[in-house]
């Protein structure tokens, strides 16, 4: 496994302004997402596996727009696993804060400012059928209505509680094959704040350490991971680096590090194929 660190992208700072026309800091968010889109697309064109270290989850707009563009060119079917406490399907009409990090899924599905919708050309960048959301437990009423109207597959925490993480991930990963590009968008607030306090928008009742490990291991078992976002980790809110250390452990599992003592049962599963390189955009 060859790792290439592309360093930090450079862009505008946070101007800390009130929303304008329903969006906070739209110009800055557009600027950053264009940078991310171009950086991720460049790595994909070199047949590398891009890893984006954010930053808030609005950066998923640029990252996934680039992945969708690449899939259209390569003929791959896209599957997006969105691991998050929130559905992120707000719009400027629904959001009281105007924060775009609560709107990335809506933007990717065609609901949002034109500057963000068309980053990768066609609008919408993705269709809801390629998206699976896991771990959701905080959704606004209007947002819930939109998610239902779009028919997005949401495996919320009640679903996880009722059937377990193994069954949840089997359902979320169903249909993935050798023609699938698997993109994982991992918002660290997906995790329960008892084990991951270092995020800006904690929501109680998230996956435990072991549930999160199983989630990552099962995605690794597909052998189809092709791009990754890791977002919303905020060291200012962390406790003795607990959240950052946990995120490292989970990403190691996502790349194939196993906690199994027994021989894994891989019947019907594909093994992880090491990518040529990992690039941090």
Could you say what each language-model-derived stretch is?
Residues 45, 49-119, 222-223:
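Active-site histidine-anchored catalytic micro-motif
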Residues 119-120, 137-155:
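Active-site-proximal loop/helix segment associated with metal-binding centers of metalloenzymes
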Residues 1-51, 59-63, 70-75, 146-281:
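Catalytic cores of soluble, metal-dependent hydrolases
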Residues 48-50, 128-132:
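Short active-site oxyanion
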